[in-house]
């Protein structure tokens, strides 16, 4: 499916479609006129003698050097080639597709002054499956994501490497196979392509989409754990959460309440249970997961604005003047990435404590040790819980803020930077870890509710358990566990666990 982009008003769910489905995108034709107008203004400046940054001058600390008109195309080509300094593994294809779509949005507002040919080329690359090889490391998040976006731009010029329908090859060959021609950059176009926050923003969006899927999954696994531990649903009473007033908490409490509705296990111990209160990892799920949902909603608002922004420099303004500014500084994205990291860390931390509760017979209210039917002879989920602790601890270390760690670059011209790019990139690893924790919780919780038989859990949670059991059989005796963990994690990461739940129960992501 091809998403039609209207710069300035692209909704978050369109960007999520591109990310989750390796989608294509194109600019709404009604924006072509703005692009043509901006390009004409830059061509007019390039034909004159007045020095304007990025059009007929050097870059960064070299901005005071005037460039001859005959060298303007060479200036832009040199800019791209010299800035291709990324290192590390290539970014995932769906992230690069998101980068390219975000660049279409930014350029499509007409304030960058690029020709319509660049827009058409990016659209064609997305449609035909020409995906630039962008090394994952090299940006400090100001002045824009220079190195990664230079690698994207190099492919447009026929330089560097690209994937064509999943196969890596020289960019010129990828373009040729797709029937596309490389571009010769005109005045300012190289700068417009690399001077923006699109790499950081795409990575932050990927982290957000994954974190929200995990947050939804955690409500399902948390409800399963609550029933497996014969926990109380009383703390999910709506009035408790309304009295506090936080939307995320209200939504989380509602989800947990609805997920547990109709559980035979819960009905069996409403009366006569000598326990007065459950541990916090059961009782305080709405407060913890709800706070994380609120944090992700705040991030969503920031990133939807940034996704629709023009983050180039200089910009062609509405009065046709060309003015230098600092929209390339990715501080909002850096803060958003740090916020997402906190939410990811805490969702995993409380989930891990639920796993620990379920495998401990001193806490699990009658479940066998490590959820094994024959403990002693079998170790059950003993080391699966240890793995979840390792993943949780790793996320704690990675959750420390990146945004406060500025360092001066480029001969002190770029003396404060955001560190948004690696702050956002770590979210991929952190959400992988979180999917791991939640996959292990799903294994433990489903095993736990089954051990409560013949009593059944709720109809909604039965559907979730069935999805897990379609991938992982019941653990009767010890077996090679890595296969089980991998399959359970995929059930969570793929969204299959969330998809099993009836629409309207789990909170959706809204900016």
Swiss-Prot record:
Post-translational modification: Contains an active site 4-methylidene-imidazol-5-one (MIO), which is formed autocatalytically by cyclization and dehydration of residues Ala-Ser-Gly.
Keywords from the UniProt entry: Cytoplasm, Histidine metabolism, Lyase, Plasmid
PANTHER family assigned to the protein according to its UniProt record, in alphabetical order: HISTIDINE AMMONIA-LYASE
Catalysed reaction, written as an equation: L-histidine = trans-urocanate + NH4(+)
Subcellular localization, as worded in the UniProt entry: Cytoplasm
GO biological process, one term: L-histidine catabolic process to glutamate and formamide
GO molecular function, one term: histidine ammonia-lyase activity
Encoding gene, per UniProt annotation: hutH
Cross-link (5-imidazolinone (Ala-Gly)): 142-144
Annotated CDD domains: PAL-HAL (cd00332)
Similarity section: Belongs to the PAL/histidase family.
KW Oxidoreductase (keyword) present: no
Protein's pathway: Amino-acid degradation; L-histidine degradation into L-glutamate; N-formimidoyl-L-glutamate from L-histidine: step 1/3
Residues modified to 2,3-didehydroalanine (Ser): 143
GO cellular component: cytoplasm
Lineage: superkingdom: Bacteria
UniProt-listed Enzyme Commission number(s): 4.3.1.3
Top-level class of the enzyme under EC nomenclature: lyase
Protein name: Histidine ammonia-lyase
HAMAP family: His_ammonia_lyase
